[in-house]
């Protein structure tokens, strides 16, 4: 709200009174918290038709970027081994199988994160 005041150079002076049930109040407050904004800002944005983007989405995206980087590095190591690069001569079959296991685990982690982002939106 402070940013809004600075951008417009004035304070908001009009207030809306909206009667709600206690469970509606709890749900609105929880939604505002998930979005990372105040209840007033949440209601103002929703009331003006803005789509609310949650903070959790950004955290999941950062986590996916990290996991994707890990997957790229693991894939690079596997590629070196498959091309018979001299730098990988010291690695045996057990090491490569462990690498493949890490790649599979990393893919599973990416799937888990994607489900955490997508499934809450699919539920009513």
Curated annotation (Swiss-Prot):
InterPro entries per record: NikA-like
Keywords carried by this UniProt record: Activator, Conjugation, Cytoplasm, Plasmid, Transcription, Transcription regulation
Gene, per the UniProt record: traJ
Residue intervals passing through the bilayer: none
GO cellular component: cytoplasm
Function comment: This protein is essential for positively regulating the expression of transfer genes that are involved in the conjugal transfer of DNA between bacterial cells.
Record localization: Cytoplasm
Keyword Transcription: yes
Protein name: Protein TraJ
Source organism, top-level taxon: Bacteria
Keyword Transcription: yes
Lineage: Bacteria, Pseudomonadati, Pseudomonadota, Gammaproteobacteria, Enterobacterales
């Amino acid at each position: 709200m402070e940013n809004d005041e600075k951008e417009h150079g004035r304070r908001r002076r009009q207030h809306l009174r909206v009667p709600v049930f206690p469970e509606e109040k709890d749900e609105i407050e929880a939604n505002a918290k998930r979005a990372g904004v105040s209840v007033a800002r949440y209601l103002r944005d929703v009331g003006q038709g803005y789509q609310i983007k949650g903070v959790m989405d950004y955290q999941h995206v950062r986590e996916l970027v990290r996991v994707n980087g890990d997957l790229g590095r693991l894939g690079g190591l596997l590629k070196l081994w498959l091309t018979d690069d001299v730098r990988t001569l010291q690695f045996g079959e057990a090491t490569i199988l462990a690498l493949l296991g890490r790649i599979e685990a990393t893919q599973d982690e990416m799937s888990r994160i994607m489900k955490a982002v997508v499934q809450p939106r699919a539920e009513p």
